[in-house]
Amino acid sequence: MGLRGLLCVCLVSLLALQAVAAQGSPTRNPKGGKKRMAVDAAVDGVVIRSLKVNCKVTSRFAHYIITSQVVNSADTAKEVSFNVEIPKTAFISDFAITADENAFTGDIKDKVTAWKQYRKAAISGENAGLVRASGRTMEQFSIHIIVGPRSKATFRLTYEEVLRRKLMQYDIVIKVKPQQLVQHFEIDVDIFEPQGIRKLDVEASFLPKELAAQLIKKSFSGKKGHVLFRPTVSQQQTCPTCSTTLLNGDFKVTYDVNRDDACDLLVANNYFAHFFAPQNLKKLNKNVVFVIDISSSMEGQKLKQTKEALHKILGDMRPGDYFDLVLFGSAVQSWKGSLVQASPANLEAARNFVQQFSLAGATNLNGGLLRGIEILNKAQQSLPELSNHASILIMLTDGEPTEGVMDRTQILKNVRDGIKGRFPLYNLGFGHDVDLNFLEVMSLENNGRVQRIYEDHDATQQLQGFYEQVANPLLRDVELLYPREAVSDLTQHRHKQYYEGSEIMVAGRIADHKLSSFKADVRAHGEGQEFMTTCLVDKEEMKKLLRERGHMLENHVERLWAYLTIQELLAKRMKLEGQEKANVSAKALQMSLAYQFVTPLTSMTVRGMTDQDGLEPIIDKPLDDYLPLEMVGPRKTFMLQASQPAPTHSSLDIKKLPDQVTGVDTDPHFLIHVPQKEDTLCFNINEEPGVVLSLVQDPDTGFSVNGQLIGNEAGSPGKHEGTYFGRLGIANPATDFQLEVTPQNITLNPGSGGPVFSWRDQAFLRQNEVLVTINRKRNLVVSVEDGGTFEVVLHRVWRGSAVRQDFLGFYVLDSHRMSARTHGLLGQFFHPFDYKVSNLHPGSDPTKTDATMVVKNRRLTVTRGLQKDYRKDPRHGAEVTCWFIHNNGDGLIDGIHTDYIVPDIF
């Protein structure tokens, strides 16, 4: 029987390594007795015959292969799934399925090519993708297939990563969750480290320590280490007669290497890797400023956990450290306004300050950061004894700038100009409301990094854990130097600081192939002295050393270099725009394809494996800022994929919006761009809250957009202070598509219990010919194949706003494919019409110009005025000059405005 891929929308973040039957549930088989007895490991006739994880680590480069064989012993075809969790830092490099003696292999191509193929077929509403959802540190890979009766299928997934040293160790984390007993289960880890292995430990969160010691074999000697976990079926059982499994959790291998020398050089096949982690250095004293968001959104558990973490961090300060605290809400306040020594008295006073501070309004992020920068800069300038300390700026926020300077480009410039490369900035984004991309760019531009703090019971530990990584700087201004003519394509080799327990890693090409030896010089500033060392490696000795690897990965140095280079290029492109960004992206894409890595710029399709509509599955790399979302409803009807970019024509690039605008926003002000006149008309509609107005109605297709008005303030009947759109209904009956949009939620097909999304979600939905992109906390774009493209803008209440409840704006991005019979308050203007303006003269308001307009055979008095386009800036908007038609658009719109009142949004 042939193999066909089924639709898979698996968007919940499960920490799992699975190969399970998609149908049925484990059947208990109690038979009594004290001894473990043979139980039926099949689930609905499907059994996992084997599940093996093989990991080979060579000089920090980890190569994983997960292989699973599933057997369908039933007389009918069964749907089975293969689900695994892999580290976010990893790149998938291969995937294959073997079934009925047929092999289906992965093919990596650039994302644009894959997406064109994918989108063309996906218009039907079906999903050919292998959707992966992000957890904290892992990503989920999932595929569903049909296995024929009395048949078997074998899955093989390969992925690679570079292990980073944190807190004195390297971590290999394998998620284990088979959900049923496995006949042959195995985790096999081989480690080869030329420096020699100093320690090797294993933890299995799902096993008691005593049992783990019995079942897990570990050994290390010299350069090699080995871990083997191979439980029998009876050892997997939760009880002697149970058919349920113990295997559910993390399998974690940790190790470290010897540090006899300050650095270690590795050369192979004209590539080199340099690992620098000197030991026994005196700790540098540090100057640290904590910049803390105390806006109202930090209320509750987040504030409590932040205070708890600060208390513990203050307790870890050393006497030679200097510090200060800056708080920002609507205003900015600092504890001392200058650095003070971490004396017992000052630390106690700081703890009291932390205990007592409270929330304060909006989010003046720019002001808080600049105050922190100012404190560090002044200390270095006015106190010479502090200039040799390691300065660090740490900022914690849970939201976006809503007070003071809010333009992100300006904030980035202000921070760059303030820091000027003197010290690193570490940004901590608390929860999923933060703009993590913005914070990451800011950190990257200032020699730091970003980390998300998840809203959970352990947020205090997350904050403290981050601080521990930067708490003990050992060197500053570290520079790793190589023979200029002998190397090329170096990865980052200058670092502001080196921290205890970490490691600096550099890789590059060796351009001079005739070198018999290779050296690296390291220069840095240490505690009270300059640090200098030279690392040297003989190529013949290295060849001899590498022969000891045996079966380990042969080209690991080159692939380590490629991995680091691609990661750095992907980070660099975030900071660039225009042609520079395009050039860096092209280089990252070229390397991703050359080394067959699935990165944010590439996709993998599985050749020869299709669903009933001929779609090949697609594997993509999710971005961290995209949230894992749960799909509710029939998966054949639509597909939601949080990791895919939107198609070109419906992707909303805020910076590239056209100047012309047609839409309706605020109280409600209608704007009609007339391209043939290169001008804009505008009018208001004055109606009561609760009234529903027809905005777009295409009788040829049935497509419609209706909007319901709300008052300025909730709960104030009879008090008319303006009306705004608080509910929109977008419908396309030909494809049974309905979308209800409010300032709180977006609901797909509300009449049939479809999924509900919040404005905190980043998502991409497809249903037949309609595509919807939700851009988190900003807008959503609806695009209809052979129809129009529309945008809904979210307006949030902000401090100082005259509007006291959230509302929506609606804009037309493209309407040229709508039928000539399209109508509605906006729809009637989708096709050309003419008017003439004459007799310009001062109006009743001497600051404005009145004129006579002839339109639709009617003569009107119109006024030159200003309205606003809120697509780029939902808070302040951009001014648009227009001719204002009075009296609810009378004379411009067909009929009168009450003709456009409809019973409901659908």
Swiss-Prot record:
Transmembrane regions: none
Family: Belongs to the ITIH family.
Gene3D superfamilies, sorted: von Willebrand factor, type A domain (3.40.50.410)
Chain positions with Phosphoserine modification: 124
Signal peptide region: 1-22
Gene symbol of the encoding locus: ITIH1
Cellular location(s): Secreted
Database matches in PANTHER family: INTER-ALPHA-TRYPSIN INHIBITOR HEAVY CHAIN FAMILY MEMBER, INTER-ALPHA-TRYPSIN INHIBITOR HEAVY CHAIN H1
Protein name: Inter-alpha-trypsin inhibitor heavy chain H1
SMART domains: VIT, VWA
